[in-house]
A protein has these predicted regions:
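Active-site nucleophile loop of the alpha/beta-hydrolase fold
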Residues: 116-126
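Gly/Ala-rich beta-loop-alpha elbow adjacent to hydrolase catalytic centers
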Residues: 93-97, 101
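Catalytic active-site module of serine/aspartate enzymes centered on a nucleophile-bearing elbow/loop
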Residues: 223-260
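Short, surface-exposed "cap/lid" segments of acyl-processing enzymes
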Residues: 3-59
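Catalytic nucleophile-loop/oxyanion-hole region of alpha/beta-hydrolase
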Residues: 59-85, 90
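Short glycine-rich catalytic loops that host catalytic nucleophiles or stabilize transition states
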Residues: 54, 218-224
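Short alpha-helix in the alpha/beta-hydrolase fold that links the catalytic acid
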Residues: 36, 186, 200-209, 220
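Short beta-strand/loop motif that positions the catalytic acidic residue
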Residues: 184, 190-192, 196
C-alpha cells in the first residue's frame, strides 16, 4: 500500500443537510483545500467531503500510474455518495479540482446544485506547459508547479517534480471539459486571481462566457496567486463561496435536484 504524505489525507466534516464536495489540484493534495473545507463547515455548518485524488499526496512514481479517468472517477464517486445523503449538493475545487468541478456539473447536472471553481483551467494552459507537451521526445518530468502563493512563508504540500505523462492527462481533461462547458446550467461562482503563474487568468472569462447558467458570477482576486485557497484571499473565498451556496439554498429550500 502506498504511503500517504502527512497532511494529504482525505477528510470529511459532518454538518447540516448541505453537502459540499471540495477537490484539490494537480500534483497537490487536500492540504491546499483543507482551510476552505474547514471554513465552510465552521462558518456555515456545511457537511464537507474532500477526497484524495489517485496518485496525489503520495509520490510522483505513484502519480505516473494514474490518469484523468482515475481522477474523474474518484471525484464522481465522492459526489454520488454525497448526493445520496444530502438535500443540497455543491462542488468547489482548486485548479484541476476546479476543472473537475466543471466536468461534474456538465455531465451530472441532476446531482449538482451550484459550483464554485477556483483558478480552474478550462481552455488555455501556460505557454511553458504547452512547449513541454510539444517536445519530441518530451522529458519524463519537469520541476514542480506547487506553491504559487503570494503570501510570504506559506507552502503548498505538492510534488517537487511533475510527471509529464500526467501533465498530458491534465491537458486532455481540460480539453474535454472545455467542450462540455455549454452543458452547465446550475448557478456558478467563478473565482480567479488576476495574477496567476500556473493557469492563465483568461480561463475565468472563457468559463463565464461558455456556460449557460442564468446565474454566473466572476470574482477576481487581487491579492493572491494560483493557490488562492492558501493565499491572502483565502478568507474572502470562504465567505464568498459559503455565502453563494447559502443563497442558492435559500432560493430553493427543497433542493434544485428535488425541483427538477
Amino acid at each position: 500500500m502506498v504511503a500517504i504524505l502527512k497532511g494529504a489525507e482525505p477528510f470529511s466534516l459532518e454538518g447540516n443537510d448541505v453537502g459540499v464536495l471540495v477537490l484539490h489540484g494537480f500534483t497537490g493534495s487536500t492540504q491546499s483545500i483543507r482551510e476552505l473545507g474547514t471554513g465552510l463547515h465552521q462558518r456555515f455548518g456545511f457537511s464537507v467531503t474532500a477526497p484524495r485524488l489517485p496518485g496525489h499526496g503520495t509520490s510522483p512514481d505513484d502519480m505516473e500510474t494514474t490518469g484523468y479517468h482515475d481522477w474523474v472517477r474518484e471525484a464522481e464517486t465522492a459526489l454520488r455518495e454525497l448526493a445520496g445523503r444530502k438535500r443540497h449538493v455543491f462542488v468547489t475545487g482548486l485548479s484541476m479540482g476546479g476543472t473537475l468541478t466543471l466536468n461534474l456539473a456538465a455531465r451530472l447536472p441532476d446531482l449538482v446544485d451550484a459550483i464554485a471553481p477556483v483558478a480552474a483551467p478550462a481552455g488555455l494552459l501556460t505557454e511553458a506547459f504547452a512547449e513541454v507537451l510539444a517536445m519530441d521526445p518530451a522529458p519524463k518530468r519537469i520541476p514542480g508547479i506547487g506553491s504559487d502563493i503570494k503570501a510570504p512563508g506559506v507552502k503548498e504540500l505538492a510534488y517537487e517534480e511533475t510527471p509529464v505523462a500526467c501533465l498530458r492527462e491534465v491537458s486532455v481533461l481540460v480539453s474535454l471539459t472545455r467542450d462540455l462547458l455549454h452543458r452547465i446550467v446550475c448557478p456558478a461562482l467563478v473565482i480567479q486571481a488576476r495574477e496567476d503563474h500556473v493557469v492563465p487568468a483568461v480561463n475565468a472569462s472563457q468559463i463565464v462566457n461558455a456556460i449557460r447558467s442564468d446565474d454566473v458570477r466572476l470574482l477576481w482576486l487581487n491579492n493572491s496567486y494560483h493557490v488562492a485557497t492558501l493565499d491572502n484571499d483565502k478568507d474572502l473565498i470562504i465567505d464568498r463561496v459559503g455565502g453563494f451556496f447559502s443563497e442558492v439554498v435559500k432560493a430553493a429550500p427543497a433542493g434544485r435536484r428535488a425541483a427538477a
